[in-house]
A protein has these predicted regions:
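ATP-dependent small-molecule kinase phosphotransfer cores
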Residues: 1-75
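A structure-centric signal for secondary-structure junctions around beta-strands
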Residues: 15, 79-80, 129
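Generic leucine side-chain signal with a strong bias for well-ordered alpha-helical environments
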Residues: 18-20, 37, 62, 85-88, ...
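Hydrophobic/aromatic beta-strand patches that form the interior of the parallel beta-sheet core
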Residues: 44, 82-84, 133-135
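A glycine- and Lys/Arg-enriched "phosphate-lid" helix/loop adjacent to the NTP-binding pocket
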Residues: 47, 51-119
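NTP-dependent small-molecule kinase module
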Residues: 91-158
Length: 158
């Protein structure tokens, strides 16, 4: 991920970007996710294949189906049971990020790209309501925490 997000690699091809993310994901599955699942543990990840479906598939125009096909081998059949989409307007998301830290290569993209990404996430949430929970990211953080906690407790029968 460090190479992929390096802002100095501005000429990286979109397919290269997709393949590098799939490779990083394959290693994550091998080293962390699969062993944890095999041990009966719950796994929480901040991003997974849906991010590539949106960023590379929609934002870069490679196609959502292409992204899922490329990642199929890397994921070894593992897909998230639940995804939380922090739904936020693209401009607001950029503004928040600029106030936090130095932007990486993806974060430095134009507003048009980020709008495609937001629209893509919303489309995926509409396509997969059984596993993607859309949360209004303008809500106070305590409310967001409560919503997520409620869904996780219900999913894990806690």
């Amino acid at each position: 991920r460090e190479v992929i997000l390096n802002k100095d690699f501005t000429e990286m091809g979109y397919m290269t970007e997709l393949l590098l993310y799939a490779s990083a994901r394959a290693q994550l599955v091998k080293e962390n996710i699969k062993p944890a699942l095999d041990a009966g543990q719950a796994v929480i990840a901040d991003r997974f294949v849906d991010s590539s479906a949106v960023y590379q598939g929609i934002g870069r125009g490679l196609g959502v189906d292409t992204v899922y096909k490329v990642n199929e081998f890397a994921l070894q059949g593992i897909m998230p049971d639940m995804t939380f989409l922090m739904d936020l307007d693209a401009q607001e998301g950029i503004s928040r990020k600029k106030n936090q830290a130095e932007l990486d290569r993806m974060e430095n993209e134009k507003l048009e790209f980020h709008q495609k990404v937001v629209d893509g996430y919303r489309m995926l949430a509409d396509m997969h309501p059984e596993r993607i929970v859309k949360i209004d990211a303008t809500l106070p953080i305590d409310e967001i925490h409560g919503i997520i906690t409620e869904y996780v407790e219900k999913k894990l029968n806690l």
